[in-house]
């Protein structure tokens, strides 16, 4: 446990609640003190949904500490069972309430005797895993519970569908453009002649989990959530899974070819070949392939970028920038420390350096040191970019309200390639455009600010030096200002004049 004002991945109970609230007609009971119950507010604020967040907090207060929690927890479970009539009630402690070391499984067993709903305790170690790991584990636990229940009742659907079908695993609430991605995946699969059997957990019903084995194979679009479920289904029912993220032209092609391989391995009577579909989509539907060869994109060649986010999106974005757009990635990083080995393996050869950390200050310092032309990261990197006056495109959760758009903005599939191309192009500040804006806008309206993460500055610029600085084109002015101030600090100069600017230029070898 640590105190922080920004966390990339939250505590474990947030992941569990995200999975529970993604399913339809599932209610979550959170055994927690006041202060841990911010999930309701966060989800209600960010997700564009009409329904209330189905989470009830069983508050740990002084009365509970004096008498024990059992009576209150069991009462909350049975009350919600009568009021909401859910299919499943999921009980989760938080890292704070876990300190009490109570036998919550005993509470669940007792409540289950009095409830019509299924009651389940989230099997997550709240001290050892983060939000994403807990979400992955909780999804697998719920799927396993309902499949084993169906096996006992002898009503498990294991007969495969006549036409090729698929389950999409890992779409869930508060994910990065997950609902748009799901829609785009459905369109892509439909065009390939593949029906979607189930999508879980987003919008799915726990009562339909017994139908998962009917599908021919599974798709896991994001590594962070769904992989454990796919591995479980493969082990139990020999269901293959595709875990390539179809983000960017190259990976979307690999994704479709992998699907063809899976279908050919299952159905020996038919031959599945999607080459013609790939060619048509790449040439006519996706504008990204054409855009990558245009003069606009060639202007971005060898521009420096920094990428940071969850493992799935950071890897995909790094490969898109380098392979498809010719942009140099100075540093690729992720906050998914549990997936560090896979991340390093994937970005090897695509970037100059790798940063794996969940400390936002290290990421901010790295960006300030590299001084990229653009950043592609989370909401935090957007804040860092604003302070350093470096444009930032948001490509990964955690994100704020502007990345839960009402319009259709997928990042996966061929329509996703268009969105990414727009995001990349619009994120870079184009030199001539910036210069023209300043010429016609006038320099008196544009104030030059210090480009560093620290806001205090003991340096003074003379009027002449400021005027000279304003004559420098905007797209390199920030670098000149930082180099001059760095030179001044090294030489203990307090007032920066034109002479100091030229001396700094000489020392930099420019």
From Swiss-Prot:
Residues that bind [4Fe-4S] cluster: 36
Primary localization class, coarse: plastid
Pathway listed: Porphyrin-containing compound metabolism; chlorophyll biosynthesis (light-independent)
Database matches in Pfam families: Oxidored_nitro, PCP_red
Catalytic-site annotation from UniProt: 296
Superkingdom, taxonomy of origin: Eukaryota
Any one GO cellular component localisation term in the record: chloroplast
Reactions catalysed according to its record: chlorophyllide a + oxidized 2[4Fe-4S]-[ferredoxin] + 2 ADP + 2 phosphate = protochlorophyllide a + reduced 2[4Fe-4S]-[ferredoxin] + 2 ATP + 2 H2O
Key words of the record: 4Fe-4S, ATP-binding, Chlorophyll biosynthesis, Chloroplast, Iron, Iron-sulfur, Metal-binding, Nucleotide-binding, Oxidoreductase, Photosynthesis, Plastid
InterPro entries reported for this sequence: ChlB/BchB/BchZ (IPR050152), LI-POR_suB-like_C (IPR013580), Nase/OxRdtase_comp1 (IPR000510), P-CP_red_C (IPR042298), Protochl_reductB (IPR005969), Protochlorophyllide_Rdtase (IPR016209)
EC number: 1.3.7.7
GO terms of biological process kind: light-independent chlorophyll biosynthetic process; photosynthesis, dark reaction
Intracellular or extracellular location(s): Plastid, Chloroplast
Cofactor note as given: Binds 1 [4Fe-4S] cluster per heterodimer. The cluster is bound at the heterodimer interface by residues from both subunits.
Residues that bind substrate: 431-432
Any one GO MF annotation of this record: 4 iron, 4 sulfur cluster binding
Requisite cofactors: [4Fe-4S] cluster
Family listed: Belongs to the ChlB/BchB/BchZ family.
Known partners and oligomeric status: Protochlorophyllide reductase is composed of three subunits; ChlL, ChlN and ChlB. Forms a heterotetramer of two ChlB and two ChlN subunits.
NCBIfam families per record: DPOR_BchB
PANTHER family attached to this UniProt entry: LIGHT-INDEPENDENT PROTOCHLOROPHYLLIDE REDUCTASE SUBUNIT B
The protein's role, per its UniProt record: Component of the dark-operative protochlorophyllide reductase (DPOR) that uses Mg-ATP and reduced ferredoxin to reduce ring D of protochlorophyllide (Pchlide) to form chlorophyllide a (Chlide). This reaction is light-independent. The NB-protein (ChlN-ChlB) is the catalytic component of the complex.
Protein name from the UniProt record: Light-independent protochlorophyllide reductase subunit B
Organism: Stigeoclonium helveticum
Organism phylogeny: Eukaryota, Viridiplantae, Chlorophyta, core chlorophytes, Chlorophyceae
